[in-house]
């Protein structure tokens, strides 16, 4: 990250006296993108005694150029900030501040989510007094073995960069380091600057030049020629290659470069969850989602191909089918992060996706995949699109509750411009699997599914962040009852901010996805669906989700079937505020089309016969890794 200062030379030698908190806020407010926009779109804040006097005063002073947003839950507002950055393809971001104690530790889950997904967020939790004079203060964690420990140390494991500021002068080095990590393609992730209460209030004479408006330049590492030549040599020997596109293609602004590469060289493209949308859903070479939650077209090609070109993907188990899907193929990995580029013994190209694809295409020249391979990909892609149309447009039988595929179809039928106009937001349960298979995305950014950490509760908070980033788009949050009950308070925040969301809530009365996985592993239905849980004399309540949403200020309704859902979606699209639609769905009928084996360890010994049978199947699958691998649909799966 380079920062170009734009202040007059006469200001270079002057100083300005500010508190540490004022310095943080003023520095962040001065940063700009190359397009002249503020790098930081704002700060989410929940104030407490650990940050209200210091950061609260500083944020108020700069409330116009660096807006402050109040939320209802610290983890949720961090999710919103992360989603904001993802919606901006990591080119803009937000900061988050909390008090000490529970406010700070509520950030840990969100920080882990940002870390796993390689997404930037700046966390500014308050911390205990450096002076220790009033110890132990309210909410202070005391460690009898280490007097320097605070609850914020829990954030070290889930931060790309962590610093505790014990003197105001340390900000002169800590803040540039923080911005470097947040804007670096290889290191990108959460940054934590812990700000002790007394240090926030301390004044220091800072160089005025430190706060001059400056443009942040995002570092895009160029590929080494020898790495490009090794990758090109491997591809030239291939006849049946497949591209696997990850989030790095979108974050590297390489979607058009990817499309040009694929068509010039006749290589089909399979999508990960993070990479979906890099190629339009109806592009002839888009063979759909890959892996455990992928479609049959991509998985057939991955299992048959002789080379996989992985671009900007972490190659997690849902992409690789627990390392069984394309184990027969040679692997080329383009990734700005060397940790990811070296996975699976790949021929690594550590570089920005756009620059690497351009260089690789130039090195390949007129080389193309075998014509019959490209033709096969076209046919499989067309067949898969027909399958998607059939699955999403075939209504449930009489007396059947709808399933996820039915809901997805109704949502997209409610507006013919949905593939290019809507942004769908989701995170956990059965829905990400069906969305990867079935949602039609026409442009980059239209598919926002958090599937690195698969964090229940991200959905509504994430939707809020997306809407703040893309207010001109219709943001549709599709969420299950389980995730909604875990975290829903930012629906009220969306109403307060005028950041309209459409929330489609599928109520299958419990954790339906894990219930199916439990039974697939031989377990009895237990503690997942509400009916299978321990209950008191009054039984489980019947939850009126529409009424709950209304209590938070949203408009809402409950619908009885798919036709009513499609009509309700049109009312929601026309509404002037957040709108929730709830619908009862079947917990037992997932989309069977597509899919691949996923390794979930089954108990080696059990008194339950079904577990013994499941263990035998699991061992067969493990043994198969040395030869044939499990085929589509052999093992029901979900996150």
Give residue spans per PLM region.
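Glycine-rich beta-strand-to-loop/alpha-helix junction loops that act as flexible
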Residues: 245-247, 311, 428, 479-482
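Short amphipathic alpha-helical interaction patches enriched in hydrophobic/aromatic residues
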Residues: 159-162, 392-395, 556
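Phosphate/pyrophosphate-binding active-site segments
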Residues: 2-4, 11-12, 166-169, 207, ...
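Thiamine diphosphate
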Residues: 132-146, 292, 341-342, 350, ...
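N-terminal alpha/beta PP-like core and its mobile active-site loop of ThDP/TPP-dependent enzymes
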Residues: 2-371, 410, 414, 500-503, ...
């Amino acid at each position: 990250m380079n920062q170009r200062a734009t202040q007059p030379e006469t200001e270079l030698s002057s100083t300005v006296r500010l508190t540490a908190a004022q310095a943080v806020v003023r520095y962040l407010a001065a940063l700009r993108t190359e397009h002249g926009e503020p790098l930081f779109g704002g700060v989410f804040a929940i104030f407490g005694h650990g940050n209200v006097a210091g950061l609260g005063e500083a944020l108020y002073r700069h409330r116009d150029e660096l807006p402050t947003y109040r939320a209802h839950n610290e983890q949720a507002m961090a999710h919103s900030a992360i989603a904001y950055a993802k919606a901006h393809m990591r080119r803009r971001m937000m900061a988050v501040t909390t008090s000490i104690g529970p406010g700070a530790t509520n950030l840990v889950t969100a920080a882990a989510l940002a870390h796993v997904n390689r997404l930037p967020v700046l966390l500014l939790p308050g911390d205990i007094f450096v002076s220790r004079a009033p110890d132990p203060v309210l909410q202070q964690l005391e460690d009898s073995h280490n007097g320097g420990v605070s609850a914020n140390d829990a954030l070290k494991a889930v931060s790309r960069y962590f610093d505790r500021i014990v003197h105001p002068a340390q900000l002169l080095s800590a803040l540039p380091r923080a911005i470097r990590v947040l804007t670096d393609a290889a290191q990108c992730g959460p940054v934590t600057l812990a700000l002790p209460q007394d240090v926030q209030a301390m004044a220091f004479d800072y160089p005025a030049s430190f706060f001059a408006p400056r443009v942040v330049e995002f570092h895009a590492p160029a590929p080494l020629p020898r790495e490009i030549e090794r990758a090109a040599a491997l591809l030239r020997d291939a006849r049946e290659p497949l591209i696997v596109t990850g989030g790095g293609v979108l974050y590297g602004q390489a979607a058009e470069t990817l499309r040009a590469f694929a068509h010039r060289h006749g290589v089909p493209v399979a999508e990960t969850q993070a990479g979906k949308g890099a190629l339009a859903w109806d592009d002839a070479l888009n063979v759909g989602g890959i892996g455990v939650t992928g479609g049959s077209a991509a998985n057939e090609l991955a299992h048959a191909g002789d080379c996989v070109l992985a671009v900007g993907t972490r190659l997690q188990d849902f992409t690789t089918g627990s390392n069984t899907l394309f184990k027969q193929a040679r692997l080329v990995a383009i990734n700005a992060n060397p940790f990811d580029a070296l996975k699976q013994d790949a021929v690594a190209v550590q570089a920005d996706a756009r620059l690497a694809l351009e260089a690789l295409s130039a090195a390949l020249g007129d080389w193309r995949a075998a014509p019959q391979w490209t033709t096969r990909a076209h046919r499989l892609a067309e067949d898969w699109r027909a399958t998607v149309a059939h699955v999403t447009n075939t209504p449930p039988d009489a007396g059947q509750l709808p399933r996820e595929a039915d809901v997805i179809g109704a949502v997209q039928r409610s507006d013919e411009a949905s593939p290019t106009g809507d942004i769908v937001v989701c995170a956990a349960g059965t829905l990400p699997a069906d969305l990867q298979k079935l949602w039609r995305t026409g442009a980059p950014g239209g598919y926002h599914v958090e599937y690195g950490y698969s964090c229940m509760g991200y959905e509504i908070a994430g939707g809020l962040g997306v809407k703040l980033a893309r207010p001109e788009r219709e943001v549709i949050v599709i969420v299950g009852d389980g995730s909604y009950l875990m975290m829903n308070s930012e629906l009220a925040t969306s109403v307060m901010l005028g950041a309209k969301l459409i929330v489609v809530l599928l109520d299958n009365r419990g954790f339906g996805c894990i219930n199916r996985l439990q039974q697939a592993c031989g377990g009895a239905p237990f503690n997942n669906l509400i009916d299978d849980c321990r209950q008191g004399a009054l039984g489980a309540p019947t939850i009126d989700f529409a009424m709950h949403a209304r209590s938070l200020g949203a408009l809402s309704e409950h619908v009885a079937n798919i036709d009513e859902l499609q009509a309700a979606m049109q009312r929601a699209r026309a509404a002037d505020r957040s709108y929730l639609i709830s619908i009862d769905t079947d917990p037992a009928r997932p989309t069977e089309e597509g899919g691949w084996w996923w390794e979930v360890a089954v108990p080696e010994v059990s008194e339950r016969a079904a577990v013994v049978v499941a263990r035998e199947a699991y061992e067969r699958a493990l043994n198969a890794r040395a030869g044939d691998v499990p085929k589509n649909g052999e093992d029901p799966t979900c996150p």
